[in-house]
Amino acid sequence: MSGWNVIVIGGGHAGLEAAWAAAKFERVALLIGNPATVGRMPCNPAVGGPGKSQLVFEVQALGGLMGRLADETAIHTRVLNASKGPAVQSLRVQNERDAYAERAQDVIFGHAGIDIVRGEAADLESDGRGGWLVVTTDGRRLAARSVVVAAGTFMRGVTWYGRHSRPEGRQGEPPSRFLSAPLASAGHVLKRYKTGTPPRVRADAVNFSELLEIPADPQPRGFTGRPGPRATESPTWQTHTTPETHRLIQANLHESPMYAGDIEGLGPRYCPSIEDKVVRFAHHDRHLLFVEPDGVQTSEVYLQGFSSSLPPHLQDQLVRTLPGFEQAVIQRYAYAVEYDVVDSTELTLNLESRYLPGVFTAGQINGTSGYEEAAAQGLVAGMAAARRSLGLEEQVIGRETGYLGVLLDDLVFKGSDEPYRMMTSRVEHRLLVRQDNADERLTPLGLRLGLVTDAEASRVEAKYSRVQAGLEALQRQRIQGQTGDSWLRRPEFALADVEALGIELPVLAAEEREALEIRVKYAGYIDRARRQLQSEAHARRLSLEGVDFAGIAALSNEAREKLARHQPQTVDQAARISGVRHADIGVLLVHLKQQRVSRET
């Protein structure tokens, strides 16, 4: 093969989505070291959760792969925050770890438009004609019009087990030794980040009777609407740390490479190691931990919330201080990994390098944390790389479109001083960009971008035509002088209750009934959110000159610190600062209003 439209470097979650998206346009090469590691879940065996499931639903709506893989290998599904409103409800799918990777490999390796190329990227060279050559360590020069670098935690990766380190991108896998150099020489500022993973414990050595069992939802949910047949087969469990856990950690902090100063990389604020939790939250006498199976008939469980870089002999002692783990045997020890990332403010909103036109980056190389964030970036980078290689018009997914737009906007305009994790609190107007309406919002966009087929778009259009027919049926029929939608707006009424009164509805699937119910019950709130969205365009131009940020108690601690440091001159500038969230902007607007009223009186 003399060349490709796009070469994707890396077979993790970002690389998979990039190759999948780019292959919808033209032929793609996926450059990987070991095919057996493609699609691997190196950390938790699950997809979704608050802020993250919304990304997966949006990736699915845009023709992506992750939601499909998660559903096909699901062993446990749960809607989190189910008792709260739809704006913050999130699906979490527990997966069969090995099956997820195997299914990903089946899909990618079986795709006629994706060529699998084995090797390690050593350099990126311009071909002098607007394209690129990916030079491998064995001297091959692979030609492409565009390149997506999705190197994960592998660029100059180092793993840490206590004070001992190894050159690895993750456990047992060699790092990418040379790829940082061409990025740095082009002008990219490289930073060192750190993340970690918990230990895996032999399941037959755990006393599950001492743990709190968390069953799967009886009616399984999926990202595609079709979770696999095993989606309710396995529970998860909950345990917690003890005072003895905390005592051991405090007494052995000198064994931690982070606290000893060996690790330079910045770790994730919202997913701290167990050492960090004990030190930063010393006033807590316990920390909750979740025990997740690696599969239905697994020999291992994953100890969510217990990531660590302490040495193996200490991990053995620590795990045995947990209820139910008194006889625990660790099969794979926890470790930390330190790696290079680019400064994401040096990218465009399509994740293209500002210094290397035609080179895109996606996933943890951009300073993010998590499978879902990586997949979302991979889809965008793969799509944009393919469109660029074909000379198609550049398309930008804006902040207002949903969680994916917020992710891109935050990375490019705010950047991050630590691994970035998507959360619902980062997103303005969450009621407008829920997980349940991702297809309605984004599938038409996916069709325009070339990511979604006419047939897929037609199915979504038909779905919401049926929802609209249901709404019209509610509005048309009256019981006891009130229309069906008026009855449904009552807090104590669900759609089934309205039907029990005698209101007749067309046949609707479960997800269509849910969409109809949300549309009716939250109509007033949704209209208000739309009006607020319009008014905020004006509010963002307001001046912050002379505002004493340190004196505004209602701001979050992080926002107060960042605002005082950066001294933004307008609300829009404040909103672009890493660590300043939508709630903080609301606090600033209230403060400005109070100042104006005070001056006027």
UniProtKB/Swiss-Prot annotation:
Q: How does it assemble?
A: Homodimer. Heterotetramer of two MnmE and two MnmG subunits.
CC terms in the record's Gene Ontology section: cytosol
Q: Tell me the compartments it is located in.
A: Cytoplasm
What function is annotated for this protein?
Answer: NAD-binding protein involved in the addition of a carboxymethylaminomethyl (cmnm) group at the wobble position (U34) of certain tRNAs, forming tRNA-cmnm(5)s(2)U34.
Q: Which cofactor does it need?
A: FAD
Residues annotated as binding FAD = G10, G11, G12, H13, A14, G15
Q: Where is this region: Disordered?
A: 216-242
- What keywords were assigned to this record? Cytoplasm, FAD, Flavoprotein, NAD, tRNA processing
Stretches of Polar residues bias are at 233-242
Q: What would be one Pfam family of this protein?
A: GIDA
For this protein, what is any one GO molecular function term?
flavin adenine dinucleotide binding
- UniProt organism field: Deinococcus deserti (strain DSM 17065 / CIP 109153 / LMG 22923 / VCD115)
Q: Which domain of life is it from?
A: Bacteria
Carries keyword Nucleotide-binding?
A: no
Disulfide bonds, paired cysteine numbers: none
Q: What is its main location?
A: cytoplasm
Instruction: Give the GO terms filed under biological process for this record.
Output: tRNA methylation; tRNA wobble uridine modification
Q: What is this protein called?
A: tRNA uridine 5-carboxymethylaminomethyl modification enzyme MnmG
Ligand binding (NAD(+)): 267-281
What family does this belong to? Belongs to the MnmG family.
